[in-house]
Amino acid sequence: MALNDFHVSEPYTLGIELEMQVINPPGYDLSQDSSTLIDAVKPQLTAGEIKHDITESMLEMATGVCRDIDQVAAQLSAMQHVILQAASEHHLGICGGGTHPFQKWQRQEVCDNERYQRTLENFGYLIQQATVFGQHVHVGCANGDDAIYLLHGLSHFVPHFIALSAASPYMQGSDTRFACARLNIFSAFPDNGPMPWVSNWQEFAGLFRRLSYTTMIDSIKDLHWDIRPSPAFGTVEVRVMDTPLTLDHAINMAGLIQATAHWLLTERPFKPQEQDYLLYKFNRFQACRYGLEGVLTDVYTGDRRRLADDTLRLLDNVTPSARKLGADSAIDALRLQVKKGGNEAQYMREFIADGGSLIGLVQKHCEIWAGQ
């Protein structure tokens, strides 16, 4: 199958997708009523899109093309308002978090959508298990070769993005001992983790053609890589973040990725090579397991350094770019988060340690998303 040409887009523009949990009080399990909410809110939208995801307990908020994080905030806030209003009218809750802490995957209903039904046929129960919730950030690129360079550059910081956004310590009623357990769900997929090595857009087109020989890949959307190019949009899409508990944190993560993209494409600090990925999965695991307390290993020198320290270094490196893009408030907020030493997974564990229940935790998450 041939790949679409890379659509030229304005560099560093943003598009954000948030996969939200649809909750059924008073038990606070996942609901199967996302279709009801989507039908209710679609006529009220003035920007962005609200749509189905894999199962009926998921709802996706997607912005249009945004110039900066202020536009991202405006679009997401407007969508949040209409979703919360409709959820209240239908006696449902909405919340973030990368996993629901006690839902059972066997109960999840796959959406009546041709693509998702085909995916269910290919992957079986793995698709129901993929009822997990992430934030995806698209960054605009001028051409396909820039997109491949940007993908490789951003891959250096996948552990940092995971650690900052980690919000999935509980799954199936248990503490997983991971800060981000969500990404483990995809480990059985044949296209999990980093994209196979290519050095330019022409090589990527050849890779996609070969992947399509499997008959499991009809479009870029069928690939579950941590970061993937999206030629139809003219973007690179970062897919490793858990959905945050607050809109503010989602906006901060978008600002970081935008600023990092600007720094990478203007400074070109790396010369990508295949060896860069030799320890990729080990460093990714450290971020998933331990969050900001994880330890990164340099593939070339063997040096080991705390992920928190390296994240502060990243934030310093991208600060000038953030100022140019109007994203410096996001960098400042994330720097404060790292210095305080926490992420949302840590907050969740503290809630339980203080005597809270998993049901109470989901209730609290719904209140946080509603701004209560």
Swiss-Prot record:
HAMAP family: Glu_cys_ligase_2 (MF_01609). The keyword Ligase applies. ATP-dependent carboxylate-amine ligase which exhibits weak glutamate--cysteine ligase activity. It comes from the Bacteria. Belongs to the glutamate--cysteine ligase type 2 family. YbdK subfamily. Keywords: ATP-binding, Ligase, Nucleotide-binding. The gene is ybdK. Pfam families: GCS2. It catalyses: L-cysteine + L-glutamate + ATP = gamma-L-glutamyl-L-cysteine + ADP + phosphate + H(+). Its EC number is 6.3.2.2. This is Putative glutamate--cysteine ligase 2. GO terms for molecular function: ATP binding; glutamate-cysteine ligase activity.
